[in-house]
Design a protein with these regions (language model features):
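Cap/lid segment of the alpha/beta-hydrolase catalytic domain
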Residues: 32-34, 81-100, 188-199, 281-290, ...
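Primarily recognizes the serine-hydrolase "nucleophile elbow" in alpha/beta-hydrolase
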Residues: 40-91, 122-124, 222
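The feature captures the conserved acid-bearing segment of alpha/beta-hydrolase catalytic domains
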Residues: 80-164, 168-173, 213, 260, ...
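N-terminal cap/lid segment of alpha/beta-hydrolase-fold proteins
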Residues: 103-121, 220-267
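Short beta-strand element of the alpha/beta-hydrolase
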Residues: 268-278
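Pro/Thr/Ser/Gly-rich low-complexity, intrinsically disordered linker/stalk tracts
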Residues: 369-398, 432, 447-467
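Extracellular low-complexity, O-glycosylation-prone stalks/linkers
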Residues: 398-416, 439
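Beta-strand-rich modules
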Residues: 427-446
Length: 476
């Protein structure tokens, strides 16, 4: 009979546990697998704040063939940090320094290498053709009190998208820089004062950012639910979606979350929006405060939208050698997981795509019915800045394109200013503190033009105050 020798280290650990009266904790039961719903993957969209914004851009560029729109809150251009496999082999810190330097504090890097890399990866099949971006609806936001990501970085994101959208005349993009927010997800009335750059990074500025993003992407929506929500916030197992690797090796949590309205749970036709938290906003750090209070669920509840909340973890190789260094729970936009981080094969992009595939795997296609040209309905002013206005409307059945007409001043004559294929329009290059009137007509594939929508008036904001010290500048 062999004598089993107990290692001395185990004896010491056992003694400590016994002396302190600590009982071994039972492992928590894993969350259930992510469910499947009747959602069309080509109606999917994504948004994020800070590192989540950089990841949203990466995902939207990598999978541009299926992503309908992208919301970029306090983020920058695609592949901004420019981390490469050579950096990884040599242990270079360059990408991390670029991420925390030019890609946050500015001035941002030259965009030409980023365009060349995106085009190179597209030719090799590592990402979708970036010219698909011309069909996406893009919302970019920088608060002038943001002391963490310089507004010049958001300017670079705007210029990156303009390159693929075809220039300033493309009305699929809207850039908001006239709100005095700090580095934050911005809400109407939840969170810290508007100019803060700390805490949970959710600031209240009387600005419904989640709703504005969703309406810029999908058109005018039903009013959000201001009462008890009908749906459920569901925890799901992220481990099966990184298998055979552990989620920790991707700096992702074992559990993610998804908000599913009752209509989507009943398998009515739905759409998916992916909402990515920023650094220091994951569940491990702020519990469910971002998930419940970012503002998406209230809009989702009345508009058949599923909101996916993937989760990162704080990573420290000193305590877990299989976890990459990620002290603030950021998404990987500089190469801390590996140097495929910005393409389809990136570990986190692959996992988020697997989540999206699962959620949309119950989709039942519906044949479109022929319809007469009708006036777009429900037209709303979705957002205004000091130099722009964003309008949205409910899609008209059978419409192939929409023509937006504008009038200003005392002149009541409307002139066409552009055509779009989707139900929203970003009108930039306007004068501050000036009213503009808009109406929209729909055109069918045969060229038949329908009647005009009702007229809405958007008044642009005044020029924001000069802000030399972000975080302390006045908010009108």
């Amino acid at each position: 009979m062999h004598q089993v020798r107990t290692p001395a280290r185990l004896i010491r650990v056992t003694l400590v546990v016994t002396v302190l009266g600590i009982l071994p904790a039972r492992a928590e039961a894993p969350a259930p697998p992510l469910g499947a719903y009747n959602a069309d993957i080509k109606e999917s969209s994504i948004s994020g704040i800070s590192s989540g914004a950089f990841m949203a851009v990466q995902f939207g560029v990598s999978w541009s063939s299926i992503v309908k729109g992208v919301g970029v809150i306090a983020g920058g251009p695609y592949y901004c940090a420019q981390g490469t496999a050579i950096d990884g082999l040599l242990g270079n810190l360059g990408p991390a320094l670029t991420a925390t330097g030019p890609c946050m504090k500015g001035p941002p890097p030259d965009l030409e290498p980023l365009f060349k890399k995106a085009d190179e990866w597209a030719r090799g099949g590592d990402i979708d053709d970036p010219h698909n971006i011309a069909n996406q609806h893009i919302y970019i936001f920088t608060g002038y009190n943001d002391s963490i990501v310089n507004p010049k970085v958001a300017d670079a994101a705007y210029r990156f998208y303009l390159h693929y959208l075809g220039g300033h005349s493309n009305a699929n993009i809207f850039y908001q820089s006239a709100i005095g927010a700090g580095h934050s997800q911005v809400t109407v009335n939840y969170g810290q004062p508007c100019n803060k750059n700390e805490g949970d990074f959710i600031d209240h500025c009387n600005y419904d950012q989640a709703g504005i993003i969703l309406q810029h992407i999908y058109g005018a929506l039903n009013s959000k639910n201001r009462g008890a929500l009908s749906g459920k916030l569901i925890a799901f197992d992220q481990r099966e979606l990184t298998s055979p690797e552990s989620p920790g090796s991707y700096s992702m949590a074992e559990t993610g979350y998804v908000y599913v309205p009752s209509s989507c749970a009943a398998l009515q036709p739905c759409r998916v929006h992916i909402a990515l938290h920023g650094c220091k906003q994951n569940f491990e750090t702020v519990q469910d405060r971002y998930i419940r209070h970012a503002g998406y669920n209230e809009w989702a509840d009345t508009n058949r939208l599923i909101i996916l909340y993937p989760q990162t973890i704080v990573g420290n190789p000193a305590t877990d050698p299989f976890t990459p260094l990620n002290p603030f729970g950021c998404w990987d936009w500089w190469g801390y997981t590996n140097f495929n981080y910005a393409v389809k094969a990136g570990r986190q992009i692959t996992t988020i795509k697997a989540m999206l595939d699962r959620l949309t795997s119950g989709h039942v296609p519906i044949l479109a019915e022929a319809a007469d040209a009708a006036a777009p309905s429900g037209i709303v002013v979705n957002d205004v800045s000091n130099t722009g206005a964003a309008i949205a409307w409910t899609p008209a059945a059978g419409a192939q394109t929409y023509t937006v007409n504008r009038a200003s001043g005392s002149d009541n004559s409307f002139a066409p200013i552009g055509s779009v294929s989707g139900p929203s329009f970003g009108d930039l290059g306007l004068r501050p503190a000036t009213p503009y009137r808009y109406k929209v007509t729909a055109t069918l594939s045969a060229g038949t033009e329908g009647p005009s929508s009702p007229v809405v008036t958007a008044t642009t904001l005044p020029v924001p105050p000069r802000c030399d010290t972000a975080g302390s500048c006045p908010i009108p």
